């Protein structure tokens, strides 16, 4: 086996409660430009990297992997690049559905899919439905997503429930507010990884990462490999998660 998926590593991941990893996959365009290529080729290489990282997550018994594929702000990019990204998204869904089932992966999409074309929306629904009963890794894809959008959407759902007398306004607490977000059925995010050198969150899972550990690397996403992923996991192992409390040492 090429990857570091030893029993010791799996046990450490379980012991440290590393269950949900979220990745901001940044640097595809710059990777291509550095090589004198069009940005679209960088996204294609980024897809290849994503496949490898998903495999590594499966082999190491990570429960949930969230990938930031397309933000709501990404619509500001050139039209040709957006078209290429949508085509790549459709290709990825169509080409990987067999592997998702083979490796017992459940696909979940979060974000506003309404602007996507009908073929893409239908295929998203198809793949989510066909993998729904898979019990291994939950592959959570954030597409046309933003943290602010998620929070506002959650607030609107709460208002509707209050208006319908389903929920009393005094019952609204942090623990049940999370139930109104797109990640309601998922475990909290333990580790956020951002590639590409930037040190910001970029409107990603703003509510869900309140107590997440943050790992930033200068490595561009297409160059990010399983060893780099393991370095991020090893960094997580060094952290003492206090969740607002004090050190127990």
From Swiss-Prot:
SUPFAM superfamilies, per database record: Undecaprenyl diphosphate synthase (SSF64005)
Domain of life where this protein originates: Bacteria
Family annotation (Gene3D superfamilies): Decaprenyl diphosphate synthase-like
Swiss-Prot/TrEMBL GO biological process terms: cell wall organization; peptidoglycan biosynthetic process; polyprenol biosynthetic process; regulation of cell shape
GO cellular component, one term: cytosol
PROSITE patterns: UPP_SYNTHASE (PS01066)
InterPro entries reported for this sequence: UPP_synth-like, UPP_synth-like_CS, UPP_synth-like_sf
Documented EC number(s): 2.5.1.31
One Pfam family hit: Prenyltransf
Amino-acid positions noted as binding substrate in the UniProt annotation, renumbered to this chain: 27-31, 39, 43, 71-73, 75, 77, 194, 200-202
Active site positions, chain numbering: 26, 74
Cofactor(s) named in the record: Mg(2+)
Keywords associated with the record: Cell shape, Cell wall biogenesis/degradation, Magnesium, Metal-binding, Peptidoglycan synthesis, Transferase
CC cofactor note: Binds 2 magnesium ions per subunit.
Reaction equations catalysed: 8 isopentenyl diphosphate + (2E,6E)-farnesyl diphosphate = di-trans,octa-cis-undecaprenyl diphosphate + 8 diphosphate
Residues bound to Mg(2+): 26, 213
A molecular function (GO) term: ditrans,polycis-undecaprenyl-diphosphate synthase [(2E,6E)-farnesyl-diphosphate specific] activity
HAMAP family: ISPT
Subunit architecture: Homodimer.
Function in brief: Catalyzes the sequential condensation of isopentenyl diphosphate (IPP) with (2E,6E)-farnesyl diphosphate (E,E-FPP) to yield (2Z,6Z,10Z,14Z,18Z,22Z,26Z,30Z,34E,38E)-undecaprenyl diphosphate (di-trans,octa-cis-UPP). UPP is the precursor of glycosyl carrier lipid in the biosynthesis of bacterial cell wall polysaccharide components such as peptidoglycan and lipopolysaccharide.
Family, similarity comment: Belongs to the UPP synthase family.
Entry protein name: Ditrans,polycis-undecaprenyl-diphosphate synthase ((2E,6E)-farnesyl-diphosphate specific)
The species this protein was found in: Buchnera aphidicola subsp. Schizaphis graminum (strain Sg)
